[in-house]
């Protein structure tokens, strides 16, 4: 006669199930995660996962929630380690990279757009909001002190999009190594910092008048007949590593 599992055993099984789901997602996307496949890999009955999760979306949402909580905790700890706003921003940024490269499978799953809507899972929405607040809090302080110009919330998304794009390029193996990742990252941060310190430009119109759009289309059509040769960017020279001071 089968005995009832203890809560500790149940928690351990759920943790193993989530770990397998995270790995399978990283290897083959959502299609490679099914209740049957998970049960088969864990060596249990196909119905066992249903005792603890409604379906695979429920499992993936649980994995994402835990990942966002770990991500937020990592950023919070980094931000609390320094007091000066600019150094805090630097520390949070370094913690972001450290998490992404230490847990690439979790990072990909956190931001995969094919996952269930966060509002279907309150805990997932809470964890995601916690991470976003942590990324934007130091920018609000910097804006209040006049260190940067612009809406802190908008700027946080601009920075997030930039760092996320760079991280995903590296995880996908799209950065050749010359220039070095750190050279690209440093240059990106320099440009972002310079932009945030610059005075805000005049607001762009919400929508271009229809006549302007038509004129733009005509100009585009004329430009096609006389193609302009592309301007190739100058190669970035890799910085020499300085000896430790």
Regions found by a protein language model. Name each.
Residues 109, 141, 161-178, 192-202:
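Amphipathic C-terminal alpha-helical segment
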Residues 1-12, 23, 200-214, 218-245:
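N-terminal intrinsically disordered/low-complexity leader segments
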Residues 30, 148, 175-176:
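Conserved hydrophobic residue
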Residues 65-90, 120-135, 139-141:
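Amphipathic alpha-helical linker/stalk segments
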Residues 13-22, 38, 63-71, 75, ...:
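Generic hydrophobic, amphipathic alpha-helix propensity
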Residues 16, 20, 24-58, 62:
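Helix-turn-helix
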Residues 62, 76-106, 155-159:
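Hydrophobic alpha-helical connector segments
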Residues 119-145, 153-158, 182-194:
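Amphipathic alpha-helical packing segments from all-alpha helical-bundle domains
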């Amino acid at each position: 006669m089968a005995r009832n599992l203890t809560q500790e055993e149940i928690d351990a099984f759920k943790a193993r199930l989530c770990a397998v789901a995270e790995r399978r997602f990283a290897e083959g996307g959502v299609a490679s995660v099914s209740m049957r496949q998970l049960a088969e890999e864990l060596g249990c009955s196909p119905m066992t996962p249903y005792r603890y999760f409604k379906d695979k979306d429920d499992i993936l949402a649980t994995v994402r929630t835990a990942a966002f909580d770990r991500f937020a905790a990592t950023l919070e700890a980094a931000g609390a380690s320094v007091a000066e706003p600019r150094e805090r921003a630097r520390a949070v940024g370094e913690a972001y990279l450290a998490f992404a490269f230490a847990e690439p499978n979790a990072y990909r799953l956190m931001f995969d757009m094919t996952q269930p809507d966060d509002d279907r899972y309150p805990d997932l929405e809470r964890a995601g909001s916690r991470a976003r607040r942590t990324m934007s809090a130091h920018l609000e302080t910097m804006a209040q002190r006049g260190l940067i110009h612009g809406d802190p919330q908008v700027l946080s998304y601009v920075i997030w999009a930039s760092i996320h794009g760079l991280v995903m390029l590296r995880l996908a193996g799209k950065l050749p190594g010359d220039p070095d990742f750190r050279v690209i990252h440093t240059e990106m941060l320099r440009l972002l910092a310079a932009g945030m310190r610059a005075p805000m430009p005049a607001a762009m119109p919400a929508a271009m008048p229809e006549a302007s759009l038509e004129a733009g289309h005509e100009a585009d059509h004329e430009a096609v007949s006389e193609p302009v040769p592309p301007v190739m960017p100058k190669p970035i020279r890799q910085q020499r590593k300085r000896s430790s001071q």
